[in-house]
């Protein structure tokens, strides 16, 4: 029988006892990893690892294309996107494809094209993945030195980092070009209830763009999540794209400084842990962004935010009761505070009742009714437009409630109502994935640091208590 322990790793690995299962000739004896450790077997086989990554990209792109076509096939133009459980079409609509004034879908053909392009691309990636996994060279260092690497080669690693940064910067500029030159993007703040427009007057002032980073993350400030006009969003992408591209060039041309060589662990598993940490941060930020921000994620497509649905309810009943003769400026609620309107601690007029906690909501249907000091009583009495009433009633009944098992809506709702907002889905999924990525970061960072410190082999098995105990049988 072959030895149970690989030459490389002395801690116990639960695996097949005959040790004969070898996947594509890369077995536990030669690599130190069993088949189920996946790409860990390919740590030193750059060609095969390339195949695994290209095939993985193919799976991702195939999902995007297939899911895109599935959503197009099921799409009903008469219903809002957020009522149909769509998570991809809202992103395409936000980019200005296929929609017109008010977020109304006027053409689904661009969505079909997007799906087909992704499916075709996935076939190319799938072929490349299979080729490099099965037919291509096991290692790239000999035949294609530019694409080869050694994990310990600090200079090569920062060059690869630089290439990645440049690609990210190009991605950021693709959005900029779409907004500036290729038809524009959807702006929920456009007059009259949202429209597609080209963004002409970019915000490039560093004090504005980087001011977002210096804001507090809490209510009324909201860090970068508080961005509420497209000029700032697209201008931010100009800054971000430029920083990524220049940072990429810098990392390609330079070698790591001595402090970085000392401070960081330079191994494949360490790079994996750094990447997982970065993706985790991205996931948590995306969670907050999709939950609170109705500019980057317009409510016409994703449904209202939580605060927006709550304020919409207060507004809807203010409109109703005002029509029935209530004086909304002075009516007292059950707690002695204003029933419809009240003052915040700093003096602004805000909606009363439970929705007071969402006083800092900004939404396109509500802002026209504000004055210099919060909600304007005379505008609330004279200027409310039918479109504002319709939209707030719609948002009130589509709050982003609902659980992960798709049991939708408010707990008191009748069973026939089964509405789950895409905001709930997207923010919850990104939070959960961000958390798992963070745990993966801790796991791989711990292993990488242990390996670098030289105690990867684990506990000394000679002194385990179990060895001195009577066998179970």
UniProtKB/Swiss-Prot annotation:
Membrane topology: Multi-pass membrane protein
Compartment list: Plastid, Chloroplast thylakoid membrane
Residues that coordinate or bind [CaMn4O5] cluster: 367
BP terms from Gene Ontology: photosynthetic electron transport in photosystem II
Residues where Phosphothreonine is found: 15
Free-text remark on how the cofactor is bound: Binds multiple chlorophylls and provides some of the ligands for the Ca-4Mn-5O cluster of the oxygen-evolving complex. It may also provide a ligand for a Cl- that is required for oxygen evolution. PSII binds additional chlorophylls, carotenoids and specific lipids.
Pfam (any one): PSII
A cellular-component GO term for this protein: chloroplast thylakoid membrane
Propeptide: 1-14
Keywords (A to Z) from UniProt: Acetylation, Chlorophyll, Chloroplast, Chromophore, Manganese, Membrane, Metal-binding, Phosphoprotein, Photosynthesis, Photosystem II, Plastid, Thylakoid, Transmembrane, Transmembrane helix
Annotated S-S bridges: none
Predominant location: plastid
Gene3D superfamilies membership: photosystem ii from thermosynechococcus elongatus
Keyword Thylakoid among record annotations: yes
InterPro entries, per the entry: PS_antenna-like (IPR000932), PS_II_antenna-like_sf (IPR036001), PSII_PsbC (IPR005869), PSII_PsbC_sf (IPR044900)
Residues found modified as N-acetylthreonine: 15
Entry's family note: Belongs to the PsbB/PsbC family. PsbC subfamily.
Role description: One of the components of the core complex of photosystem II (PSII). It binds chlorophyll and helps catalyze the primary light-induced photochemical processes of PSII. PSII is a light-driven water:plastoquinone oxidoreductase, using light energy to abstract electrons from H(2)O, generating O(2) and a proton gradient subsequently used for ATP formation.
Subunit field text: PSII is composed of 1 copy each of membrane proteins PsbA, PsbB, PsbC, PsbD, PsbE, PsbF, PsbH, PsbI, PsbJ, PsbK, PsbL, PsbM, PsbT, PsbX, PsbY, PsbZ, Psb30/Ycf12, at least 3 peripheral proteins of the oxygen-evolving complex and a large number of cofactors. It forms dimeric complexes.
This protein's name: Photosystem II CP43 reaction center protein
Annotated source species: Olimarabidopsis pumila
Taxonomic path: Eukaryota, Viridiplantae, Streptophyta, Embryophyta, Tracheophyta
